[in-house]
Each structure stands twice: as structure tokens, then as C-alpha cells.
Amino acid sequence: MLRSIFDFNQRSTKMVMISHKLDLILVFIIVIGGSIFRRVSANFTVPCNGRCGGLTLPYPFGFSNGCSIRFDCSAAEKPMIGDFSVQNVTENSIFVGLSHNCTRKIEDMNPLFGENFAPTSENSFLMENCNRTTDGCSIKQKFLENVLKLKSCDATGNISCFSLDSNSSSKNSAKFFSMKTLRNSSCSLLFSSIAFESVGVNAGIALEFERVRLGWWLKGGCESGTCAANTDCTDVETPHGYAGHRCSCLDGFHGDGYTNPCQRALPECRGSKLVWRHCRSNLITIVGGTVGGAFLLAALAFFFFCKRRRSTPLRSHLSAKRLLSEAAGNSSVAFFPYKEIEKATDGFSEKQKLGIGAYGTVYRGKLQNDEWVAIKRLRHRDSESLDQVMNEIKLLSSVSHPNLVRLLGCCIEQGDPVLVYEYMPNGTLSEHLQRDRGSGLPWTLRLTVATQTAKAIAYLHSSMNPPIYHRDIKSTNILLDYDFNSKVADFGLSRLGMTESSHISTAPQGTPGYLDPQYHQCFHLSDKSDVYSFGVVLAEIITGLKVVDFTRPHTEINLAALAVDKIGSGCIDEIIDPILDLDLDAWTLSSIHTVAELAFRCLAFHSDMRPTMTEVADELEQIRLSGWIPSMSLDSPAGSLRSSDRGSERSVKQSSIGSRRVVIPQKQPDCLASVEEISDSSPISVQDPWLSAQSSPSTNTLLGNIPR
């Protein structure tokens, strides 16, 4: 009995031991299985769906739970953040549309402040109902009406800019807005916003109206190790206080830097395109050139790169605020949306191109109101171009003269600033003188254009305070409207004169053949520099010749030198445009000679020997009114257009112009006959120096003390 009990106990003990072993094995299986399950789960996380309709976004953006930055896919298959449409995503920004709304509350902006994104300091919010003036700019309602095409808002509304000051010079620590910041703005309504960014290495600024720029990040610093291989990790100081980061592929690699590893871009010489000798030759050339130049430029390039990297963000921020303030403050100029400009020119089509100027290309365009305009697109994306467009806007909006081209508006939304002018259907004076358009202009019309142009330039010199010097007067900058009236254009090289001195030291700018020779040598700019350029235009009007023509004899390549030589030696008739010589009457021939004498004085080498533009305009007006009545048809041949009978019946010797009477002698074979000048009160002639002390008020020049 005892033995049986003992045996039973032994069996029970063995069973218990086996049971414990089974329990241990089960626990081991559960632990190991759980570990294996977790590892498997880690390798098979919920995927990120980056597709919305026909759009596919790269990770970390997407539309499902597996995406670190999740957007909504609307019924219209467009990415959304709440009620705001996502317009673009880049390696560091999310661009969201923010259309104008007169009643939008600040709290409605909550969806734009997420766990992984927020508006950056590269925005300027347009606020309404502000209790105090914001630190940013103040925008007039008319400006917003022009840019945003508003119709429903109260025109008396108080619109102010609200921006963050960029105090950091580091590219990687851009400041962010917060809801608390907006609530503390003392404004109750948020009307819209303007996003800006730097374009190009010299910090040109592009403004995007009705847009918000959001900076994005993933949680954790770069030490979290979420970036894939061949990436550059950027630490982000988030507005929430915790660390954030962004991953981006290195130069020469492509991918998203996270789930899609960055792979090196494939070279051209590969696969079916592999031609060993061709690739080997290219490789040797590339490697040799790279190695040879790299060591020479590396240190210098690195120095400038570091310097620009530290200064660009702050300069960009301040430039954008300055541009916005200046643009908004000048309510007399309309601001056109970039989309309207692009549509007006058919996407800046070659068919709409009118010509190429010193700083940009001019296109013909048709606005939404069916008005034809000339659109000048500046091509330089640098700080000089930005200053250039603001300078031209200020100049053109401050002048008002019937013979100066009128600025209708501008566009500063994109990197290329755009100016919009009134359209001139009859082209330029140069086109008509060179017969590129029409069959030539009659003398009476040429004289009218010259007179109107001189009056416009004289207005810039004498009626503006300080005076404005054009610096690029030429026949291609003299436009003709529907009635062939002159319109002086292109203030791209204009500079404001200084009242305390008669010259400005600056680098010579302008067009070869028109540039003041004294200015080119001495770097002194004055009103007389424009007088010289206009003298070249007068020579063009008389001769119909090109200003610089290498097909002419060597001594006659430059029209100014040719005109001075022929006029000074009494051979004016040799250079008169043949189309004017078909049937000249006495007054026409006399007036051509008188204008030639005026051109001769304008082309004097020394500036103090030239007349002022006011004197030039007065003399041309006297010539124009002296002997003819403008009754002509522009469709008639130039040679058949004469002066009036009153002018034709006069003898040349009796043709009085002001206080002068010009006697035109018979042309001698040696072409050395002098021009006899009979004057009631003035001893001045073509051969005598034109001294400013005799008739010009501008006597204070650098050459004033040179003995004559």
C-alpha cells in the first residue's frame, strides 16, 4: 500500500515537474513570439498613401494614417488642410492658398498650426479691425483692390501688415508664427496673406499674394536617425518647443530621404546609350577640367558661400518688407496679378514680343478689359533689378507730360518684375526712319516729333525737382502713338539729378553712338549729356542713317562724327535723307539747314558749348511754327508733302526764325562754303563756340575755368 502510494507520489511529482516545464516553455514561447511579432510588426508598419486623384505626394506627406504629415483628400481630389487648399510642397515648405475674406476670424487659422507645420516668418498677414498700428506696413484699400480684384469689401477698412522680424542669420532656424502671436496682434480679422521668398543668389524677392508659407518638420532631432543614407538632415526649432528635423537628399541624389532611399542620379552613358569611346572622352574632359579648376576656386567659393549663407535670410526678409511697403504706399500705380499678365501675353509668347531692351524684354498684351498694353519683363533676378523696377515706378508715377510714356501698372508677384505701359501702335521713330515700318516720314512730321521729344526732355530737366536725366535718349526710345505724337520711353537708366552740383559721378551707361563722349571719358553726368544724345537723334531725323553702321567708310561709321564733319564744312545737302529731297521747297530746305545747325551745337564735345534742352525745345518750336501749316495726310508720299503756300512763297533769305535769318549759299564743288549767319542780336554761328554764358543758364561745370 505504502509502495503504491509512494509510486503515485513519484508519478505526481513527475507530472508536476513536467507541468512546470510546460509552463516555462509556454512562457518562453509567448515572450519570444511577442518579440518576434513586434519585430515583424516594425517591418510591416501601416503604409503611407500619398495619392489623391492624379496627384502623388512624396513621403512624409500623404493622406492616410501611415503618413507623418497627413492632408485631407477632398471630393474634388485636391489636397487640403482643413478648408485650405495645398498648392505646393517643397523640401522645406508647404504653400497653402488663403483667398481674401472680409470676415475671417483669427481662430479660423487654427488648422494651419499643426503638430508638424506652422506659418513661417516669411509671410505677411493682412489684418483688419486693428486697435493699433502694427510694426509692419500699412496698405491702402485701393492697392488691395488693384491686386486682388476686390469688389465686396468696405473701401474704408483698415488693412495692416503683420510680420515677424527676422533676427536670426541662420538659414536653418526660421521663426514661426503661433496662434498666440496672431491673437496678440490687436486685430480681430485676418483678411489674407502674402508669402515671400528669395529668388537667386542676390536675394531678389518674389511675392505671392493670397498664399501662406508653412514650414514643416518631423518630431525629434537629427540624432533620432530617421533619415536614410545619402541625406542631409536639418534641425528645426519648432514653435512648440521640442526638437524637429527635415531630411533631404544630397546634391546628385534623388528620393524622399525617408522610406525612399536617396540614390545617385544615373549618368547619361549607361545601358543602350553606352558608347565607351564617347563616354571615355567626356569623362577625361570633365575630370581634367574639374580637377584643374577646383583647387583654384575652392577656398574663394567657400568663403563667399559662407558669407552669403549667413546674410541672405535677413537681407531677403528686410527686402521683402521694403518692397511690400513701397509698393503698397504708392497707390497711384495699379498692381496686376501675375496670372493676368501671363494670360495677356499668351505666356510671354514669342509672337507677342515687341523687342529687347537693356534690362528686359517688351511684349504686347491684351488685358481683361480688352485694352492693349506694352509689358516690359525685367530679366535680371538680382538686387539691382529690384531697385531698378522700384526706381522706374517712382519716376514714371511722379511725372506727367503728354509726350512721356505713361505707366499703367506693374506686377511684383514673381521673381521677374513686370512693368505695364500704354501701347504705342505706330512703333518707334527708328523703325520709320530705317523704313522698317512704313515708307518714311515727311519732314513736317519729323520736325513735330523732334519738337515734342525736346519738350518732354526739357520737362524732365527743368520742371522736376530734383531734375531727372534720362541717360538713354535714342530713336528706339521715341515711340509714336495713334496720331504719330512722340512718347519718350524707357526710364530704365534714369537717375535723379542733384541740385547742389551740376554733375553726378557714375559709371557710363547708355547706347553706343548716343553716349556723351565727355561723359564717357570723365564720368560726369549732367543735363548736357541728354542734349548730346538728342543731337544724335536730330542727325538721324535729317539723314535717315543708322547711328552706327560698319558698312559705311571707316571715317563715317559713327553718325555723330559724320554729321559734325558735313555740317561744319557746309555739306549738309550731302547727308539729307533722299526721301526728303524729292521735291524740296524753300522753307523746307531752310528749316532742315537750321535744324542741322542746332544738331551741330548739341553735338559739341565740351558740354558747356551745348545749349540746354529748354533752348533746344524753344528753337525747334519756332522753326516748326515759322513757315508752314500742318495740313497733311500721313498716307501721302513724303516727297509730295510741302509746307504751306505762305512758306513756299517766301525766299530763303527772308525766312525768319526767331531773331535769326539763315542764308543758304549755293553748294560749292569743294563743299567748303560757309554758312552765312545774319542775326539781329546774337553773334553766334555754326563755327563760333556755343558758350553757355551767352544764352545758357547752366554755367557751373568742370570746364567753366578753362580759358577759351
Curated annotation (Swiss-Prot):
Its EC number is 2.7.11.-. One of its GO terms (cellular component) is membrane. It is a single-pass type I membrane protein. It is an enzyme of class 2 (transferase). Residues 43-285 are extracellular. Residues 307-708 are cytoplasmic. This is Wall-associated receptor kinase-like 14. It comes from Arabidopsis thaliana (Mouse-ear cress). The lineage of its organism: Eukaryota, Viridiplantae, Streptophyta, Embryophyta, Tracheophyta.
